[in-house]
Design a protein with these regions (language model features):
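Proteolytic cleavage junctions
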Residues: 540-558, 563, 652-749
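N-terminal active-site segment of His-dependent metallophosphoesterases
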Residues: 30-110
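Extended active-site neighborhood of metal-dependent phosphoesterases/phosphodiesterases
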Residues: 112-236, 311, 332
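Active-site environment of divalent metal-dependent phosphoester hydrolases
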Residues: 51-54, 103-105, 135-142, 212-215, ...
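Non-catalytic terminal accessory segments
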Residues: 30-34, 358-542, 546
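His/acidic metal-ligating clusters that form di-metal
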Residues: 91, 203-206, 217-314, 407-409, ...
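Feature responds to low-complexity, polar/acidic, surface-exposed segments characteristic
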Residues: 705, 716-741, 748-749, 753-800, ...
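Proteolytic processing hotspots in large secreted/extracellular or virion-associated proteins
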Residues: 558-691, 695-696
Length: 907
């Protein structure tokens, strides 16, 4: 169908427009690699220490067990269920559990946990579960049942290696398990190790680093030990598996119970049983073979440590804390190939709750509102220290006191005999007015457990460290020991001769170094939430995330114009962002697209709104719409309008800078409103008439509440809908009015001019001369012979009336009069448009039954056919259910009717 002259655009002009738009608003970068290559979601739990509630009873034996460590055993079953529920909600591809699944290797506990894990697999289709044993899990003589009639604990069923395999047969027999380690004849060490290949490109090696068989226990017995070790043949086998996987082009990760890299500088000296023996040698060998990351546990701490070999190969040891001790975390890791790199996003979940459980100690059902806060209260206590102090005293004597064994035994015996009084006084050594030595010890230790060991101590902790360093604390400690255990004169003299000034100084220095080592871990910057580039050329960066004037950094990567940001639950909590507006400022990255992976989007959902700032503008969304599942991509991109949108923009097409907010969640377009800010340079006309409109696929124009402020345009547009910056000079046309889009269309296409520089007078009635002038301009202002109307005169509408009369579009009110200044009625407008359509040789066959309107009888005979056609064509649809044919048509109504006429009849 022939197009009218005012809407024609040449190919050269279009190309120029597209180039200008591209320069103004850069094109959206494709989310490269988003659906290609490795993309694994992994959940990690460790040290679940499950004890069946059926084995718990409030007895002296059970309370003694509770006092021996910090585990939340009574609450444990409910805690484990809650964290498994978190895994269920996350729907990962893989769940890793890095040992100490049970309290003390109770077979009943392994079977219970296996059942829970199998149910989890049913609930999360496709989930692969891989487990490995910890030092508590196999051949543990401490396996006990505390729920007995007489209150005396009895032995529970002890788990043998074969029992472990049987309980977790669904793991060991899984189709993805491609190899198992078989020790040489007569040996058992490492026998629970295996290799799995859950997907193309990734190999996972489960390493049994525990000592429970006579060929690798220090006493040559088949009884568990806390320490970890790998036999030479297990190391060789694991190295072969790593090399074989690399030969296939796989990335290799592992998991085990014991650590491969120290998680604080003094760990090899004071807590070496939490690392495998010869850790440096073995870690180096594995890293050089191609192992990139190992997930560990054992220490009940959240920490990430890295080591790099002389050959330049780096191994990351990601240690996960226990469910049952502060901060009771779960890890959520995503492995994804981005460009040429493999990226690991490590997030920590804590502060879960509420958790309801039966408390066997009180006989009541109780609720934990916040597990992390609850666990923090379960730090070291005097009762617990009474239980473990003997070992600590022995180690201190061995390290600092050079005396005969008999003397050492004498000191040790006296201290143990009076341990309760000593511990009570020692923990209460004052540090400040309201803090004591136990407070400092708990703070330092828990900061390491929680992955918060950044050296940013509260003032009172620093005071405590200073007192340790100066020797003041050790002086008070030894004075307390002397008072309670060596009070007689002779013993006191002997004690002073042993604990000389030099010994005290060495002890102070040692304790201070331990505290600083645990409280200020400098090996890796973030132990809870980290972004690790395991291979490739990408570099980890950071992006500012802010809320209420507080700013923190979130890890990020930039690739191919896309800045992927990794906000976390911990970051959102520390910002206090719940229910508030959050800004993710990626502008410094230079990227035009901001991406957040699924878990990060769920973290952002805690906010009310999220504002993403890219290099070319910002986009603000309601946070709830970002957490529906899947990755979030947002970008302000140049847009190429379709034909209907080109007509809507009309004469402003070459200056409108069409753009679109491309926003998706899991590949699905977001259509919700989005507040946008983008850079814009006004032309010579200035900025006071600038606004923004959104233009639908069919050319529908809607206000975007656009306004120019200090070098930027601000607006609210539907995401994934073309929008444009346009000039609209009429201040009396409300952007919320029903006719706003129609008047914009008319203005953009030169159909109407205003009644003044900034007035349109939308409610003013239209004259006959105005209407004919609009059609004349629509036709391209053709010349015509003079009309017979004597009242058209020499005026702005004269040529339009001449043209309309010459072509039978108007007939006048008499043979010689046109009445150009008379108000055009709705039926006159229908008649004029009907004749114009026939002049254009458009299809005018459509008819509607006007009797449906109560005022149909008031339509003049000459206009009946035209009104029927106009109604059937959707041009005149009535007002409040009536045709009101004799009413004058307002300028706004005429704009709307002409808009419909052009789009419905001409195009």
């Amino acid at each position: 169908m022939k197009k009218t002259a005012f809407l024609r655009r040449g190919t050269c002009v279009l190309l120029a427009i597209i180039m200008v738009c591209t320069l103004i608003v850069p094109a959206l970068a494709a989310p490269a690699g988003a659906d290609e290559g490795i993309n694994l979601k992994i959940a990690v739990l460790s040290d679940t220490h499950y004890l069946s509630p059926d084995m718990i009873k409030d007895t002296a034996d059970f309370r003694k067990s509770l006092n021996s460590d910090r585990k939340l055993m009574t609450e444990g079953s409910a805690i484990n269920l809650k964290l498994l529920e978190a895994v269920r909600e996350d729907k990962p591809d893989i769940l890793l559990i890095s040992g100490d699944i049970t309290k003390d290797g109770e077979l009943e506990g392994h079977r219970d946990m296996a059942a829970r894990l199998q149910q989890l697999q049913k609930d999360v289709p496709g989930l692969k579960v891989y487990v490995i044993n910890g030092n508590h899990d196999v051949r543990n003589a401490g396996a006990k049942n505390y729920n007995t009639p007489d209150g005396k604990a009895v032995k529970a069923t002890r788990t043998q290696p074969s029992d472990f395999v049987s309980a977790y047969s669904f793991v060991y027999n899984d189709e993805t398990v491609i190899a198992r380690f078989v020790p040489s004849e007569g040996k058992e060490a490492g026998q629970l190790s295996y290799v799995a290949r859950p997907c193309e490109g990734v190999t996972i090696i489960a390493l049994d680093t525990c000592c429970y068989s006579k060929d690798n226990t220090s006493k040559g017995k088949n009884e568990h030990e806390t320490r970890g070790a790998m036999s030479d043949e297990l190391v060789a086998w694991a190295t072969e598996q790593i090399s074989a996987a690399k030969a296939k082009g796989d990335h290799v990760i592992a998991f085990s119970h014991h650590g491969f890299v120290p998680h604080f500088s003094m760990e090899p000296e004071i807590l070496k049983i939490y690392l495998i023996e010869d850790f440096k040698k073995i870690a180096t060998q594995f890293a050089d073979a191609g192992l990139e990351m190992v997930f560990t546990g054992h220490m009940h701490a959240n920490d990430i440590a890295a080591m790099t070999t002389k050959n330049g190969n780096t191994l990351y040891d990601v240690e996960t804390g226990s469910n049952l001790t502060y901060p009771s975390p779960a890890r959520f890791v995503q492995l994804r190939e981005v460009g040429d790199s493999l990226v690991a996003s490590v997030n920590t979940l804590n502060h879960v709750g509420p958790i309801t459980y039966y408390n066997a100690l009180t006989g009541k059902t109780e609720t934990i509102k916040d597990l992390t806060a609850y666990g923090k209260e379960a730090g070291f206590t005097p009762e617990m220290l009474n239980t473990v102090a003997g070992t600590f005293v022995g180690n201190i004597l061995k390290k600092f006191v050079t005396v005969e064994t008999s003397v050492s035994d004498w000191i040790n015996a006296r201290i143990i005999k009076n341990i309760q009084a000593i511990v009570t006084d020692v923990v209460n050594i004052p540090i400040t007015e309201d803090k004591n030595l136990l407070d400092v010890a708990n703070y330092i230790y828990q900061s390491h457990l929680g992955g918060e060991d950044d050296g940013n101590y509260p003032d009172w902790v620093q005071v405590g460290l200073d007192k340790v360093k100066s020797g003041e604390v050790v002086d008070q400690l030894l004075a307390i020991v002397k008072k309670h255990a060596f009070g007689d004169v002779a013993s006191g003299i002997k004690f002073d001769n042993i604990f000389t000034k030099a010994v005290k100084a060495a002890m102070s220095d040692y304790i201070y170094r331990i505290a600083v080592s645990m409280g200020n871990d400098t090996n890796f910057t973030d132990d809870n939430d980290a972004l690790i580039v395991l291979s490739g050329s990408l570099k980890a960066a950071s992006v500012a995330v802010s809320c209420d004037g507080k700013t923190m950094n979130a890890p990020a990567i930039v690739d191919n114009g896309v800045c992927t940001v990794f906000p976390t639950r911990i970051l959102m909590r520390e910002l206090g962002a719940a229910g508030k507006a959050v800004t993710v400022d990626a502008s410094a990255s230079g990227a035009e697209t901001v991406c957040v992976w699924e878990r990060g989007a769920k973290a952002l959902a805690a906010a009310d709104k999220v504002n993403f700032i890219a290099a070319n503008g910002s986009m603000e969304f309601a946070a709830a719409g970002l957490a529906t599942g899947g990755d979030v991509y947002t970008a302000i991109a140049s847009a190429v309008p379709n034909d209907a949108q080109k007509r809507a923009l009309g004469n402003q097409l070459n200056t409108a800078a069409p753009f679109v907010v491309n926003a998706t969640v899991d590949g699905n377009a977001i259509t919700a409103p989005c507040s946008v800010t983008l850079g814009y340079k006004p032309g010579d006309e200035g900025s006071n008439t600038l606004t923004v409109v959104s233009v639908g696929d069919k050319g529908e124009i809607a206000s975007a509440d656009g306004r120019y402020e200090g070098g930027v345009m601000k607006c609210t547009v539907p995401a994934n809908t073309l929008s444009a910056v346009v000039r609209f000079p009429f201040f009396d046309v409300s952007e919320g009015a029903w006719y706003f889009g129609d008047i914009v269309y008319a203005y953009n296409n030169g159909l109407f001019s205003g009644t003044g520089d900034h007035t349109f007078e939308p409610e003013t009635t239209m004259t006959r001369g105005m209407l004919v002038s609009v059609l004349w301009r629509l036709e391209g202002k053709p010349e015509a012979a003079a009309s017979p109307f004597t009242d058209s005169g020499d005026s702005w509408y004269t040529k339009a009336v001449d043209w309309a009369a010459a072509n039978g579009i108007v007939a006048g009110t008499s043979a010689t009069t046109f009445e150009p200044n008379a108000t055009v009625t709705r039926e006159q407008m229908a008649a004029i448009l009907f004749r114009y359509a026939n002049f254009k040789k458009l299809d005018t066959s459509a008819r509607a039954d006007l009797t449906a309107f109560p005022d149909a009888g008031s339509v003049s005979a000459y206009a009946t056919d035209a009104m029927s056609w106009a109604n059937a064509s959707g041009i005149i649809v009535g007002s409040n259910g009536k045709l009101v044919p004799q009413d004058g048509a307002s300028r706004a109504q005429v704009a709307a009717i002409l808009h419909r006429f052009i789009e419905k009849c001409i195009f």
